[in-house]
Amino acid sequence: MGRFAGVFFNRKVRKGFRKGRGDVARLSIVPPRTTLTLIAQLMSWNSIIGQQRVKNILQHAISENKIAHGYCFWGMEGVGKDALALEFAKVVNCLEPRVTSSGIESCDNCRSCHQSDKLEHPNIKFVFSLPAGKSTDSRDDSPIFRLSDDQIKLIQEQMHIKSENPYHNITIPNASQIRISSIRDVKKSVTMSASQSGRRVVIISEADEMTTEAANAFLKTLEEPHDQVTLILTTARHDTLPQTILSRCQQIYCEPLSDEDIAENLVLKMGVERSEARLISSFAQGSYAKACEFLDEDMRAMRLDVIEILRSALKKSYYRADMLFKIEKLTGEKDRTRVEMMLMLLMIWLRDCYAYSLAGNNAMIINIDQQETIEKFSGAFTGADYPAAIQSVEEAISHVRRNVQLQLTLLTMLITCRRIFLREV
């Protein structure tokens, strides 16, 4: 399955390890297949969501043969930094690249492209945090020698998912640091003769997770550029990286994605219904990876539950018992993340009601499948101070994040909304 942190994978079944060229280990385990909801597509610049400015910069650098020795792709999590780095690596190694009106593309058909798509290309090295593993006496051992068979299997599975979905955030238990052994392995690999023509590209994913020792070792590698080698850092926290490293890289900002781009890709790639995709994208805050995480949540059921609580609070009479019962039911598991999501759903729903009260059928609303309900609610509370109600929900979200007692937070918000909509003194 390609290479990670200095490890080469091949497709033949053997037992154990054997030494490959130099001191780099070859791991011979057939990667397991993982069932994905993702509709697999060939990687290309067009498969990367948004980021047109960054694509133009990279394509121009390739076309004009002005590729930097080091890059730092930075921006919030889930906006495609790894996807951009992997596609760049694929294009510069393509055997038959195509020049188009928009720039330069990989052919998607040659052996090199197929290797890149599977993260199996010998010229592409993808480095990320690994567990510490067992200690060894040798400082030259590849970090893979420290890991158990179960850890190696999990890493293979995560790399397979990454090859199918470059927006996937690799998650390995007890892996929070990129250690010096991984960077030593990088240095070793870029100094060896390449086994295949093309440009060697090393991608350090979430580079801010490098230890101080690892960062110092990486700096030395940056200071000794090699022909046909490019080092790419990706990070959501570039301000935590040493300035000595950043100053030697071309820094490229990857901006948050638009709700429209996220929703469109949820529909096309994940098969999500358009109305649900719009709802999820409004939560994602510009991150496609975060949007994908929300796919496991029953957003519509949560939305219905929180709207029902609001309706209970707005009953003319005998509302307290029903409202308190529903609050207790909602907060029974003390799941703050779920409560926060439900409050965000309520906030978006109230914003839609406010927009509808101002523009009627011309309003641009997120909860398009709730238009009839929104119309009825807006009609029942004409002239209501929606901004004040929305602010009360925002304050409740803030209290949830600050660990204020959940039942008290929801009760205060609902009583405030009742006073606003029923105009109680």
Model-derived segments and their meaning:
Residues 39-213:
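Clamp-loader machinery-focused feature within the broader ASCE/P-loop NTPase space
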Residues 1-5, 11-41:
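Short, low-complexity, charge-dense intrinsically disordered segments
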Residues 188, 220, 243, 247:
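Conserved adenine-binding aromatic site and its adjacent loop/helix in ATP-hydrolyzing domains
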Residues 191, 217-227:
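Conserved catalytic/switch belt of AAA+ P-loop NTPases
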Residues 44-104, 111-115, 227-230, 236-345, ...:
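Charged, glycine-rich active-site and insertion segments that engage polyanionic ligands
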Residues 196-201, 226-232:
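Loop/turn-to-beta-strand initiation segments
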